């Protein structure tokens, strides 16, 4: 999965997919009442990027629905996975469940079209704080209550705080999650970060009894870092430059080893070599 980083305005969806991304990451900020408000990152953000692009969250979801609904004039068949980077740092811990409920209702209405031929992309809810694990239950319970438990087949989870792998496992246990787990590791492109924890996550994924299904590394903009990440065995690379990742994947060393995921590749099934 080539994951376009910080895609927060509707027009950027086409921009990143046309550069080679089959997945995007979108920031979601919340208001004081835990309503998803804007798709917005804000300052500071990655070096070389504008941090200030934004939409109202529901407008973005509608644009995303168009881009991922077969038959729509805006349809992009390659776009198969969306990571919502949930900016829950502005919330009190006791608002996490409420944020999950409200996010579920917004997605159900504006993205899934109330279960009636809505967007088809797989969704990853990425949460920065392990203490906010109740967001997951708020989200899953709401989809069930609204009569759409089948949509949970399209939803996965990520804790993005670079916490110890064992601590992340405990948070999932509390949240009642087993499966559909992506594990992120990374840092802003302005700084360097080694691959120690990525390798630990990959080992957990491949152990047969770990909690991780897929591992992605962020933010990867350079060819050398891309090669290191592919060599470490990641499933996804988040990037500001999808074309760079696509180029590396076409190099002789990689073109017979890795390929771009398609809609038929389940993002929840651990790939067995």
Swiss-Prot record:
Top-level taxon of origin: Eukaryota
Family: Belongs to the arthropod phospholipase D family. Class II subfamily.
Active site: 5, 41 (nucleophile)
Binding-site list for Mg(2+): 25, 27, 85
The keyword Iron appears for this protein: no
InterPro entries reported for this sequence: PLC-like_Pdiesterase_TIM-brl
Pfam families for this protein: GDPD_2 (PF13653)
Chemical reaction(s) catalysed: an N-(acyl)-sphingosylphosphocholine = an N-(acyl)-sphingosyl-1,3-cyclic phosphate + choline; an N-(acyl)-sphingosylphosphoethanolamine = an N-(acyl)-sphingosyl-1,3-cyclic phosphate + ethanolamine; a 1-acyl-sn-glycero-3-phosphocholine = a 1-acyl-sn-glycero-2,3-cyclic phosphate + choline; a 1-acyl-sn-glycero-3-phosphoethanolamine = a 1-acyl-sn-glycero-2,3-cyclic phosphate + ethanolamine
Cysteines paired by S-S bonds: 45-51, 47-190
GO CC list: extracellular region
Protein's organism: Loxosceles hirsuta (Recluse spider)
GO function term, MF aspect, one: toxin activity
Gene3D superfamilies per record: Phosphatidylinositol (PI) phosphodiesterase
E.C. numbers: 4.6.1.-
Name of the protein this chain belongs to: Dermonecrotic toxin LhSicTox-alphaIA2aviii
């Amino acid at each position: 999965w080539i994951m376009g980083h910080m895609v927060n305005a509707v027009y950027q969806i086409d921009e990143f997919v046309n550069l080679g991304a089959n997945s995007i990451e979108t920031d979601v900020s919340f208001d004081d009442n835990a309503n998803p408000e804007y798709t917005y990152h804000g300052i500071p953000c990655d070096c070389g990027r504008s941090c200030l692009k934004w939409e109202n969250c529901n407008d973005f979801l509608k644009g995303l629905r168009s881009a991922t609904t077969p038959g729509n004039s805006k349809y992009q068949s390659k776009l198969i996975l969306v990571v919502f980077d949930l900016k829950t740092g502005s919330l009190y811990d006791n608002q996490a469940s409420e944020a999950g409920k409200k996010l579920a209702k917004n997605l159900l209405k504006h993205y899934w079209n109330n279960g009636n031929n809505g967007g088809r992309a797989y969704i990853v809810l990425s949460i920065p704080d392990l203490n906010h694990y109740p967001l997951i239950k708020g989200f899953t319970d709401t989809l069930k209550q609204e009569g759409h438990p089948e949509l949970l087949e399209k939803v996965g989870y990520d804790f993005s705080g670079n916490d110890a792998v064992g601590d992340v496992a405990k948070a999932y246990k509390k949240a009642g999650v087993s499966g559909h787990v992506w594990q992120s590791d990374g840092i802003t492109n302005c700084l360097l970060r080694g691959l120690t924890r990525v390798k630990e996550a990959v080992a957990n994924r491949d152990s047969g009894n770990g909690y991780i299904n897929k591992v992605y590394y962020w933010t990867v903009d350079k060819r050398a870092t891309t090669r290191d990440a592919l060599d470490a065995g990641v499933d996804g690379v988040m990037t500001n430059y999808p074309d760079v990742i696509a180029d590396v994947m076409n190099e002789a060393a990689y073109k017979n080893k890795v390929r771009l995921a398609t809609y038929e590749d389940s993002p929840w099934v651990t790939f067995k070599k």
